């Protein structure tokens, strides 16, 4: 309606859509209605596209995505809704990729880098929240033991064999976030000397720290081993 017959200004329509999406998300959690939450997220992701006035204000776009994805993380704290997490992840990184291919220049680095880092860490956190929620719901089984100093090949094989079966490790979200975030990071740091190298150091440090944090949790062994594998890949 805004596009065909602009009765209201775009900011007002945008704000109304934000409120509507937030209300639907709250109702979805209270009523345990995953489909409603899914519709809210899809509508929320479509909102900036539907009400875009062509001004190209990317800071508003990325701030909105950060707010929306924070809401997804809040839902993940209470619900292990994997399709919802994946929808948010795919939509967010596709929007970022489309904008980057169309509009990114090195001058945008200082303002876009914080958003990229935030979403990388946020969706890594959502993968952790998913694992913990699945455990609390009884969705995990005991894992065969694997030494913390096991070779990388053994760790990857262990994850591939058991990660899907126990339904604790959301391998698509965890490794997909890693791959998408690092690819975008390499793209926006291409103008910097050794940009990709320093980015790999950062990723290795974060995943290594995450593995250390989970060192004492036997229930989340597969998640800890996944973080260790990610750290070794970037080391």
What are these regions (language model features)?
Residues 1-235:
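Alpha-helical multi-pass membrane segments and their bilayer interfacial helix-loop junctions
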């Amino acid at each position: 309606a805004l596009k065909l017959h602009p009765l209201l200004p775009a900011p007002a329509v945008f704000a109304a859509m934000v409120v509507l999406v937030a209300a639907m998300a709250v109702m979805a959690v209270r009523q345990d209605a995953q489909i409603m939450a899914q519709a809210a997220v899809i509508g929320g992701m479509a909102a900036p596209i539907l009400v875009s006035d062509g001004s190209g204000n990317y800071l508003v776009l990325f701030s909105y995505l950060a707010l929306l994805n924070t809401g997804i993380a809040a839902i993940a704290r209470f619900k292990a809704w994997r399709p919802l997490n994946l929808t948010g992840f795919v939509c967010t990184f596709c929007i970022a990729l489309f904008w980057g291919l169309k509009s990114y220049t090195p001058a945008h680095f200082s303002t876009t880098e914080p958003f990229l880092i935030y979403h990388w860490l946020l969706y890594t956190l959502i993968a952790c929240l998913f694992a913990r929620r699945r455990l609390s719901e009884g969705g995990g089984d005991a894992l065969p033991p694997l030494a913390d100093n096991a070779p990388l090949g053994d760790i990857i094989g262990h994850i591939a064999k058991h990660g899907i079966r126990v339904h604790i490790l959301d391998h698509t979200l965890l490794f997909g976030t890693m791959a998408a975030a690092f690819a975008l990071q390499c793209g926006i740091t291409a103008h910097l000397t050794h940009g990709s190298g320093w980015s790999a150091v950062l990723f290795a440090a974060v995943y290594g720290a995450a593995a250390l944090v989970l060192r004492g949790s036997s229930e989340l062994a597969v998640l800890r081993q996944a973080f260790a594998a990610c750290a070794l890949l970037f080391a």
